[in-house]
């Protein structure tokens, strides 16, 4: 049984949702955790990524 009626259980709709999301929500979805030295320096755990940012893919 579905817990939340506003979230689709269809796989293709779930995959499409971040691409069709508004920019202020997509910004939160497309974020990456910062390294430990940057985390200590700036006090920010994760940062929204932009074009030309370098990220390390750890899974997926």
UniProtKB/Swiss-Prot annotation:
Q: Where is the composition biased (Polar residues)?
A: 1-11
Which first-to-last residue range defines the signal peptide? none
- SUPFAM superfamilies reported in the protein's UniProt record: Translation proteins SH3-like domain (SSF50104)
**Highest taxon above the source species:** Eukaryota
Annotated Gene Ontology cellular components are:
large ribosomal subunit
Q: Where is this region: Disordered?
A: 1-43
Q: Which GO terms describe its molecular function?
A: structural constituent of ribosome
Alphabetically sorted, this entry's keywords are:
Ribonucleoprotein, Ribosomal protein
Q: Which InterPro entries match?
A: Rib_uL2_dom2 (IPR014722), Ribosomal_uL24_euk/arc (IPR005756), Translation_prot_SH3-like_sf (IPR008991)
Q: Name one GO biological process term.
A: translation
The family this protein is said to belong to? Belongs to the universal ribosomal protein uL24 family.
Q: What is this protein called?
A: Large ribosomal subunit protein uL24
């Amino acid at each position: 049984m579905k817990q939340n009626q506003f979230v689709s259980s269809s796989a293709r709709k779930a995959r499409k949702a971040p691409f069709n999301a508004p920019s202020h929500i997509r910004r939160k979805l497309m974020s990456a955790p910062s390294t430990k030295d940057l985390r200590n320096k700036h006090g920010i755990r994760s940062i929204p990524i932009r074009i030309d940012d370098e990220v390390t893919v750890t899974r997926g």
